[in-house]
């Protein structure tokens, strides 16, 4: 994990520094970081899980390519679950990975206190699997759906759902992508290295939380084509991408019990959601635009380069729709009270002695940053608990 301890003004206590120093900024991103700092902000290097060795490029698995964000890594250089956990685990003879397998339901013993069988369809063939411990890591939507599908006479509203909260409190963040177009091209390849949290808890004008500013991976014309009008010329999209800084803005999505996962009469997943915290997000976007108008004057054009390709401030952006579920959390929340939570502090179901949920479902609130590192850290924590339990 790359990062610099103490840069993020919202950083909580850490037991020690990051294992690797932060990924460096490319020149255009460094210039923007310097501009933000000049304005009194505290920009910081985005913590990144990549296998990068900047001191010795020949020894580096990561090559700082433009497809790091949003694409599988073809050289296995992301510190993701596959590279760090699944692939090493498969080196052991007692680990089996079943592909094309769909877990239909979890069946309990007659007492309802433990899971007896995991019912799987594997390439159309029904199978039963059993184990002393069952861990669901399907993601907040599919874990909730699995528990609801697994209702029985002991768990009439869904497995582990005596509290009635399984599927509720779905959160996926209030997210937007904003392209800031400028006269000067942006030659950056590895763009996702800078973040700003100065408005995480609000601003002088707005005393409520606003959120987090960072970057997406560098956009290109082909990526933009998916959201552009059908008749948009390809060269226009290419030109826009070559002259853009591509921001990702995240605001906290509040835990509304009516934002929830349910099943329809055929067992299909229904995601019901009403957006919230929209005013804070709008103000975050406006604040970023205000900051961009105060950039250092361009040495080439003699004025704010960000006046845009068409001699005016120009932004292109969109809110991420409900289908953008990458940050899904909250549907099987943990807590000490079985009446208001489905999991205990170790992410074990209150109602089922051998069921654990270790994905984003356990979150009680979403925060306003990518939940991936928190999910990973919690998985390691629960793993230590399981080792102790199985001794």
Can you describe what each PLM-predicted range is?
Residues 56-61, 109-116:
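A short, glycine/Asx- and small/polar-enriched loop/turn
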Residues 1-103, 312, 319-324, 333:
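Conserved redox-cofactor binding core of oxidoreductases
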Residues 78, 132, 159, 277, ...:
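Alpha-helix N-cap/helix-initiation motif
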Residues 365-386:
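A conserved FAD-binding loop/helix module that cradles the flavin
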Residues 92, 101, 105-109, 116-190, ...:
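Glycine-rich loop(s) and the adjacent beta-strand/alpha-helix scaffold that form part
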Residues 17-23, 72-75, 270-279, 366, ...:
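Active-site rim elements
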């Amino acid at each position: 994990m790359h990062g610099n301890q103490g840069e993020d003004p919202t950083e909580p206590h850490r037991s020690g520094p990051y294992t690797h120093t932060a990924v460096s900024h490319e020149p255009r991103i460094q210039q923007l970081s310097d501009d933000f700092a000049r304005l009194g902000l505290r920009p910081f290097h985005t913590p990144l899980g990549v296998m990068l060795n900047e001191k010795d490029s020949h020894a580096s698995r990561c090559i700082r390519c433009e497809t790091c964000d949003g694409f599988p890594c073809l050289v296995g250089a992301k510190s993701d679950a596959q590279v760090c956990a699944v692939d090493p685990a498969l080196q052991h003879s007692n680990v089996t990975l079943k592909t094309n397998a769909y877990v239909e339901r979890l069946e309990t013993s007659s007492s309802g206190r433990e899971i007896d069988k995991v019912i799987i369809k594997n390439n159309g063939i029904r199978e039963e699997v059993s184990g002393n411990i069952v861990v669901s890591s399907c993601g907040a939507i599919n874990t909730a759906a699995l528990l609801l599908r697994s209702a029985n006479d002991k768990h009439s509203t869904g497995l582990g759902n005596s509290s009635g909260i399984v599927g509720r409190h779905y959160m996926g963040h209030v997210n937007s992508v904003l392209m800031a177009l400028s006269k000067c091209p942006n030659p950056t390849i590895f763009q996702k290295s800078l973040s700003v949290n100065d408005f995480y808890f609000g601003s002088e004008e707005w005393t409520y939380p606003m959120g987090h500013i960072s970057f997406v991976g560098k956009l290109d014309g082909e990526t933009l084509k998916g959201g552009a009008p059908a008749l948009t010329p390809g060269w226009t999209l290419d030109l826009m991408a070559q002259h853009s800084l591509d921001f990702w803005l995240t605001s906290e999505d509040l835990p509304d019990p009516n934002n929830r996962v349910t099943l329809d009469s055929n067992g299909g997943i229904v995601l019901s959601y009403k957006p919230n915290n929209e005013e804070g997000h709008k103000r975050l976007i406006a604040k970023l635009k205000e900051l961009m108008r105060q950039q250092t004057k361009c040495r080439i054009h003699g004025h704010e380069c960000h006046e845009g390709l068409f001699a005016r401030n120009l932004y292109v952006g969109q809110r991420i729709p409900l289908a953008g579920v990458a940050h899904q959390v909250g549907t099987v929340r943990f807590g000490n009270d079985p009446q208001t939570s489905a999991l205990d502090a170790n992410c074990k179901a209150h109602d089922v002695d051998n069921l654990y949920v270790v994905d984003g479902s356990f979150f009680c609130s979403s925060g306003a940053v990518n939940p991936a590192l928190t999910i990973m850290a919690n998985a390691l924590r629960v793993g230590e608990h399981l080792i102790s339990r199985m001794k």
